[in-house]
Amino acid sequence: MWQLLLPTALLLLVSAGMRAEDLPKAVVFLEPQWYRVLEKDRVTLKCQGAYSPEDNSTRWFHNESLISSQTSSYFIAAARVNNSGEYRCQTSLSTLSDPVQLEVHIGWLLLQAPRWVFKEEESIHLRCHSWKNTLLHKVTYLQNGKGRKYFHQNSDFYIPKATLKDSGSYFCRGLIGSKNVSSETVNITITQDLAVSSISSFFPPGYQVSFCLVMVLLFAVDTGLYFSMKKSIPSSTRDWEDHKFKWSKDPQDK
């Protein structure tokens, strides 16, 4: 870990008695947010991390090889396939970031999304991206081979709240001029909350409402019994105190 620190920052750490593991981790952001792009696309990678007053340089790594750029943003003016891979960054007062993947594809169309795994009720943003942003019309987004959404002019497709039914294979197609073009297929996965999943496994959907009603009724009955018993206890105590017992003598006391 020490060899990854910038020389100036290393001296500062030693003098301050700090350790490398005490530093925050840098973070890489893609701008725009898509990690799958087409050739000729413009891509910007930004490094977020702390800097010392003496050293505001940034170290960039592509597939573990050091890049010459030392600014906080790394620009790719026209992406090529060999730009694909993992990118990391590090600042003078941060440790090496986690890797961010960039995929450069060749084709007319590419279906883009920030990621491919979502939780239930999360929003999904899909984009049917054309090469060099060529005009695209009569666009259809398809799920499992069936049309899901149609736009006369190219538009992004939003799913406000994802459900398990939104899992599946997706691609988009449209017309560039009179040419019919399609993107590659990608898989989107919707995961379920574990707590909800465990309840659902015990009770089928048709019985969950009935189960809740039964629980409410049981609670009401239990509460009624509690107050009824609480009210009767003092009365029973008074009856016990007022009752006179007549003891019989032993035979030898007669």
Swiss-Prot record:
**Might you report a single GO cellular component term?**
extracellular space
What range(s) does the Ig-like C2-type domain occupy? 24-105, 107-189
One example of the protein's molecular function in GO is: IgG receptor activity
Q: For the site Important for receptor turnover, which positions are given?
A: D222
Q: Which residues lie on this side of the membrane: Cytoplasmic?
A: 230-254
Principal place of residence: membrane
Alphabetical list of Gene3D superfamilies matching this protein: Immunoglobulins
Q: State which ranges are Extracellular (membrane side).
A: 17-208
Question: What InterPro entries does this protein's entry cite?
Answer: Ig-like_dom (IPR007110), Ig-like_dom_sf (IPR036179), Ig-like_fold (IPR013783), Ig_Fc_receptor (IPR050488), Ig_sub (IPR003599)
Does the entry annotate any disulfide bonds, and if so which pairs? C47-C89, C128-C172
Per its database record, what is this protein's job? Receptor for the invariable Fc fragment of immunoglobulin gamma (IgG). Optimally activated upon binding of clustered antigen-IgG complexes displayed on cell surfaces, triggers lysis of antibody-coated cells, a process known as antibody-dependent cellular cytotoxicity (ADCC). Does not bind free monomeric IgG, thus avoiding inappropriate effector cell activation in the absence of antigenic trigger. Mediates IgG effector functions on natural killer (NK) cells.
Organism of provenance: Macaca fascicularis
Kindly provide the name given to this protein in its UniProt entry: Low affinity immunoglobulin gamma Fc region receptor III-A
Give TM segment ranges: 209-229
> Quick check: keyword Transferase in the entry?
no
- Changes after translation: Glycosylated. Glycosylation plays an inhibitory role in the interaction with IgG1 and IgG2.
Q: Which residues are glycosylated?
A: N56, N63, N82, N180, N187
Q: Which UniProt keywords apply?
A: Cell membrane, Disulfide bond, Glycoprotein, IgG-binding protein, Immunity, Immunoglobulin domain, Membrane, Receptor, Repeat, Secreted, Signal, Transmembrane, Transmembrane helix
Q: Domain of life of the organism in this record?
A: Eukaryota
Which terms does the UniProt entry file under GO BP?
antibody-dependent cellular cytotoxicity; calcium-mediated signaling; Fc-gamma receptor signaling pathway; natural killer cell activation; natural killer cell degranulation; natural killer cell mediated cytotoxicity; phosphatidylinositol 3-kinase/protein kinase B signal transduction
Q: Quaternary structure per UniProt?
A: Forms a heterooligomeric complex with ITAM-containing signaling subunits, either a homodimer of CD247, a homodimer of FCER1G or a heterodimer of CD247 and FCER1G. Interacts (via transmembrane domain) with signaling subunits; this interaction is a prerequisite for receptor complex expression on the cell surface and intracellular signal transduction. Binds the Fc region of antigen-complexed IgG with a preference for IgG1 and IgG3 isotypes. Interacts with CD2; this interaction is involved in NK cell activation and cytotoxicity.
Q: In which tissues is it expressed?
A: Lymphocytes and monocytes.
- Compartments in which it is found: Cell membrane; Secreted
Recorded topology in the membrane: Single-pass type I membrane protein
**Which residues are the signal sequence here?**
1-16
Lineage runs:
Eukaryota, Metazoa, Chordata, Craniata, Vertebrata
Site keyed Cleavage: positions: A195, V196
